[in-house]
């Protein structure tokens, strides 16, 4: 079970992500953003959190043009599984792999806290072990987590069960309290909370374990 973890200039969560997937039996590779290929046995691509290119211009706006993103787009189009966490979610939106955009938090401040969330849809590889409306706790740490999408596309997200998670108290102003989504084919996932930081009791929550474990093992079966 191999996982390609993409590193951009400014990425800072690659080693947390690497550690998390290694706990579930994943063989992890750190892939540089200038690379033009993925490992030949790659089952899953993860774009971790951080501040790619210092978040200059707009979060993820520069990273979307890196050579590796063309490879990831092809990988996703062929049905490969892709996960974007925090800055990775922003990059996937900028690259057009996920709909919508992430704006500055409504309070204009960086928010770092343990956050209560609610499972919206479990009909996907990422959340299949959870129950609908189940409340979980994951850390968030972002300044630009305010998810925006227009009304027409929001209706499509709902109809296609693409909304994965919602905040219970909407700390950043996101439309419909959305914290995570997937694409229509349900092989590209993005969320602002950090499941890789919630895999051990000593970290305050284990609620992220099943997300990563589910996705890794489903991706291997593809």
UniProtKB/Swiss-Prot annotation:
InterPro entries: Class_I_gatase-like, PRibForGlyAmidine_synth_PurQ. Its main location: cytoplasm. It holds the Pfam family GATase_5. The active site is at residues 86, 194, 196. Keywords: ATP-binding, Cytoplasm, Glutamine amidotransferase, Hydrolase, Ligase, Nucleotide-binding, Purine biosynthesis. SMART domains: GATase_5. It catalyses: N(2)-formyl-N(1)-(5-phospho-beta-D-ribosyl)glycinamide + L-glutamine + ATP + H2O = 2-formamido-N(1)-(5-O-phospho-beta-D-ribosyl)acetamidine + L-glutamate + ADP + phosphate + H(+); L-glutamine + H2O = L-glutamate + NH4(+). Its EC number is 6.3.5.3, 3.5.1.2. GO terms for molecular function: ATP binding; glutaminase activity; phosphoribosylformylglycinamidine synthase activity. It is found in: Cytoplasm. The keyword Cytoplasm applies. GO terms for cellular component: cytoplasm. GO terms for biological process: 'de novo' IMP biosynthetic process. Pathway: Purine metabolism; IMP biosynthesis via de novo pathway; 5-amino-1-(5-phospho-D-ribosyl)imidazole from N(2)-formyl-N(1)-(5-phospho-D-ribosyl)glycinamide: step 1/2. Residues 2-222 form the Glutamine amidotransferase type-1 domain. HAMAP family: PurQ. Part of the phosphoribosylformylglycinamidine synthase complex involved in the purines biosynthetic pathway. Catalyzes the ATP-dependent conversion of formylglycinamide ribonucleotide (FGAR) and glutamine to yield formylglycinamidine ribonucleotide (FGAM) and glutamate. The FGAM synthase complex is composed of three subunits. PurQ produces an ammonia molecule by converting glutamine to glutamate. PurL transfers the ammonia molecule to FGAR to form FGAM in an ATP-dependent manner. PANTHER family: PHOSPHORIBOSYLFORMYLGLYCINAMIDINE SYNTHASE SUBUNIT PURQ. Part of the FGAM synthase complex composed of 1 PurL, 1 PurQ and 2 PurS subunits. NCBIfam families: FGAM_synth_I, PRK03619.1. This is Phosphoribosylformylglycinamidine synthase subunit PurQ.
